[in-house]
Amino acid sequence: MLLLGILLLIFNPFHKSPDERALSELGFIKGTCNDSDASTATPDSECLALRAKPTMTASQVAAALPHLKNSDRKIELNLGGTQIDNLDSLKGLDDLESLDLTNTPVWNIDALKEMHSLKRLVLHRTDVENIAALKGLTGLQSLNLWDTRVSNLDALKNLRDLRELDLRDTQVRDLNPLEDLPHLETLKLGGARNVRNVDALSQLSSLQTLDLNETQVDSISELKKLRGLQALYLANTPLRDIDALKGMSSLRTLVLDGSKVDDIDAAQGMLQLNTLVLARTQVTNIDALKGLTGLQRLNLADTRVENIEALTDLKSLRMLNLFRTRVRNIEPLRGLTGLQELYLANTPVEDVDALKGLTGLRELVLYGTQVRNVDDLKAALPKTRIVW
């Protein structure tokens, strides 16, 4: 019994103080803190992470406030999934560094005006439209407004410490308020269908990840200054010209599927490129990919590509999607022994002898082809899942 008591004391997440026990009784579950500057865990001695049960009410949050104020640690509070719609009970919580309100009926965030300790705020899937209350929160480093009604970003002009900003599926149109955010590293605008002009982003020298999927962006000429960009997403946009990307040697991920792009010469020399998605584009010539020895994932599905000789020496390729292309000759793949996934469905391919030495293949999709020697291929690749 003594041993059991000791174990319970050690593993009980709220054994440290009466305040934490009270918080547990009110419906809070203790979690793991994350460093605001990284993905590493922060010691419990420095941080208190609390997640509310879905049944949490505003009155319970109000009752928790005195106990939260007694903490000498920074606080990360997750109220996501609750029915809390009023934040007044949080006023005076000076040590709050992270607040997650995902999928709550919150619409008014005026109660956050004086929370200058906030570094991370998540308003994903709330009814928030007006974010004027944030204009003085200059310590904010991460702000998530995904799937909200927000359209005006003026309040963000002076939040110069922002590192991450998620504006996906918002009503945002004017990006000028973002032009002077020197530390912004990640900007997500996917699904913000009113966005057309991204010239204001040209001065964001720290930007590493930019998501413009499902926007109306048709020109990226001003983005040529973003030499530190590592990931760029432009799926399902009216974009045709990617010449601005020439010389962007830091790019690791480039997603263009469903765009109007037909020329990828700008990809020449992108030696760091790891993932390239060209599905459903007008691309027919992939010679620009010669020499991109770092490429691991290439998607050419639903294009008119016919010749894949440019892939002959791309030994790092792990996934290749040629679904519904015009490729007939796959001899250039013979030496790509690192391939793990190969999709050849609905192509004119007939001869697959070139694949017999690719013993690392985990999945090979051949349905909709005229391949005749599948039995021989199965014998040569006993560990490969072949779908045909």
Please annotate each region the language model reported.
Residues 31-37, 45-63, 72-89, 95-111, ...:
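Concave beta-strand-loop units of leucine-rich repeat
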